[in-house]
Each structure stands twice: as structure tokens, then as C-alpha cells.
């Protein structure tokens, strides 16, 4: 296997592991509670610790397929047909696109529920416009409720849905709420129904971590959590001390894994740049200037090339 292919395989594996750890961290109830407090009207102003108990069960992380016909699964218990999220047969359904995180939240009235989906994006995709994908996801979360959350024509039982997209490495910090509105063209008839069923939150995280103030509170938390620049101690200090989030062992482990993997990804990328520049005839001094590596470090990377090929 040649060097470029080896590096590509290694990078893909590292990025996959990084993505898995990132989703597990985002899927922690304490983190999800902070997201809900800043994005869902009913929870705004609440203490995130009080919202944790509203999150029902364990959030499904990378298990529920997005594809029509596969989001739900039926089972039978005591002669009764039950329909829920499809979280089984991951091997059979390997390769399917899945929701990053999806879960139910019990509202403050203790009766109604909403469905929350959280998606993490390292940057804006090049092959399609991200808002179009978000619209598809939120539409699937609405349509898949049939037979799971309501039956036949009981459309009044449709649960409200939020699809929250956390987009990293943006030029600026931002947050937008995309939702349905009614525009009267002729007359002003009040059509019955709920315009608030479908909600998309686009949350942009700037490359630079914002200061801790009320406006950017959520951006700072998620920015620190997902940063590829901060050390483990810096991340845990912000998350634990500034946001009073309990740092349990599995949480600390995932933060550690993410930090190690992100450093590995950066190192692999730099090594690939160095090798490509060397092949194109750049001098060691020129490569050192561009990559901010010492000449001795560059020589070590270049010397490894024949052995890896």
C-alpha cells in the first residue's frame, strides 16, 4: 500500500473515531440540557440541571436511520403491536445515513413531548447546501411519527420537532431559527393548526472561542467541547468550572480521546503537506517556513517515506 493511501486510511479512521467521540459528548444529557435552554422557548431561562430530568431515556446516538421506511421498527409485546425508533440491525443496515443524536423531551407541563435531533458538522459541506439537508431531516422526523406517535388520521397528535445543527469552523458565531410562518395573501382567515411543529436551529461556531457572556454562552460551551486547539485541562476547566457540569469518568475519557485524535489528525495533515511539497521540489527551508516545523522534523518525515511506500 503506498504512503498516500496509508495516510488516507489512517486519517479516515482517526476522523471516524473523532466524530464518534464528539457525538457521545454532545449526547451527554448535561450538554443537551444547555442546548435546550438556549434553543427551545419553553426551557429558556431555566437552570440546565432542571432540564436534564426532562430528557427521556438514553439519547439514540448514530443508531436511528434517516431513510424513509427504516426510521421506525415494530415489535409485539403481550399481543400488542409497538412501534418505536429503529435502533437494531446496525450490521444489516450498515452504510445507512443515521441521525447523529435523537431523543424525546418531556415538556414542563409533564404531559406533552417534543422530539429533538442534534447534528454536528465540522464545516459547511461542499456538495450540497446544509439548510436543505436540515429541512429533509426535520421533515423525516415529522413524517416518521405516523404509526409511532400517532395513527391513521390523528394529525393533531403530531409532536413538535427541533433539528439542531451545530456547525464548526465558521467565520462568525451565529444562531438562526428556521420555522413556518403564515402570510395572508387574500383575507385573514385563521386556519386551524400548529405552525410551530417544524423547527430548525442553525448554530454556527466561530473558529475562535468567544468570551463567556450571556449572548455566546452556548457557543463558548460547545466551542470548548469540540475544539481541536484546546488541551484536555483547558476544556475540562471551561466545562466544569464555568458551566458547573459534572465531569464523570466516561466524559473525561471522551474528551481525552478527542484531544489525542485531533492532534493526530493535525499531525497527519501536516505530514501529508510536507511530503507533497517535498515531491514538488520545495526546499526544506521553504517547507519549514510554510508548515512551522523545524528542518530536522521535516527530514524525519521525509526519510520515513520510502519505508512506508
PLM regions and their residue ranges:
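Accessory alpha/beta interaction modules
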Residues: 1-199, 211
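Short, charged alpha-helical interaction segments and adjacent helix-coil junctions
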Residues: 5-12, 16, 116-121, 211-309
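Generic structural signal for hydrophobic core residues of well-folded globular domains
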Residues: 39-40, 105, 167, 206, ...
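Polybasic (Lys/Arg-rich)
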Residues: 201-209
